[in-house]
Structures are given as C-alpha cells and as structure tokens.
Amino acid sequence: QLPEALWSQAALWWRGEPDHEPQLQIRVTSLGQIKLLQQQWVNWLRRLPVQPVEQDVVLHNYREYMLTDCAGLEMPECKLPHQSEQAKLKRVAMAGSSDFFNQAISRAGLEALLGQVQQRQQQGLSGGILLTLMGGAISSVPADHTAFAHRDALFSAQYLVSRPVGADEKLMQGAALWVNHMRTVMHAYSTGGAYLNYTDALIKNWSEAYYGRHYEKLQQLKGRYDPEQLLRFAQGIKPA
C-alpha cells in the first residue's frame, strides 16, 4: 500500500508482432515528495525477482505534466486539426473498455488476463491494458457526495486498442469486441463497474456499470435541468 502522496500505474502494451514481446511499464508519480518516491521505488525493486530493463526519473512542473502530449509544441500547435490551422495533434481510432476492482486480483485472475494478452499477441493484434491505482484522495470523498460511483475501488483496469484514423473498420469492430470481452474474462474478480470517460457501447447494463446506485438521483437531476434531452447520446442519463 503506497502513501497517499504517491500514484502508480502498470501499463502493458503489445504490438502483435512476433519480434516484439509485450512491454510492461511501471509508473510512479509524486507531487513534490521526491525522497518518499525514491525510497518506495527502491523498496519495490528489492522485492522484484528481476530487474527493470531501464529506469528513468523525470521532474516536471504541473503545467508541463498536464501538457505532456504537447511537449515541444507552441500553444496553437497543441490542438486537433479542426481547432487550429497550425494544429499538430492527431486523433486516433480507439476501442476502450474498463473494470474496477475492490481487491487485488488473484493468481488465477492474473493468469486469465495475461492469457488474453498472449492470445491477442499470437493473433498479430495490438493492444494495451492499464492498471491504475486508486485510493488516496479518491477514496477520501464520501460515496454520495458526487456522481462518481467507484470511490471504494483499489484500482481500475483499462482495456485499449489504438490505431491511426482510417484504420480498417472490421479491425476496429474486432477491437471493440475484444475490449468488451475482457470485462467478461475478468468479471469474477471485478466489481462490474466501468469508467464513464470513454463509453463502451457493448455494455448492456451501462447505467449500473457507470453510475451504480447514483443513477436514480442523476435521473432526477436530468429531469430537472434537461427534461427535453438536449444533451444526449446512446448511453446518456434518461430523465426521470
């Protein structure tokens, strides 16, 4: 269990190419407490049966960190093509789904997860899985104070496939099926919750997955402020 000043994430990426094994990155971030981070990192390395291929430590101010994708760009360039003629950021075609976990995944759960990674790699298909630590300030807010329904989660999982814009439609349809299938594979270990910030159109019980027991209250608010559903999408909150 990390101190609340630290945040960590395990990022597993693979290209679906025989000559490139899946790559695991462990990221730890600290707001100003460098010595604490370094000590925790050393303690963690001592527990590993193997050593990392490479390590690096980077210091950023807050603004730089929030604009990481815009490193080396002027502000007019740090935009998408439809936002500025000078834009240099590019959109991607993405399929994404997610899970929340209230406890550590068992060995059987990890084997199930890695089995799916291996299968997709052998099929020549790329992808990524992010395991992101929660707790800390997230869990310190009472569950009924905001619409976010996953305050008790220990960590989240994000299942991702990212391709260039214009990627083959059948390839992206298959990617959407795979990321959603990961929820089925991990169902025995997860809470059943899902991360709202990118919706998964294949989640059937989306209102429960995104909002949990908050959905009815959100329906009441929707009915009060947007009864005609001016703001709407397929998995949007329906007014009470």
PLM regions: where:
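Soluble FAD-dependent oxygen oxidases
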Residues: 1-240
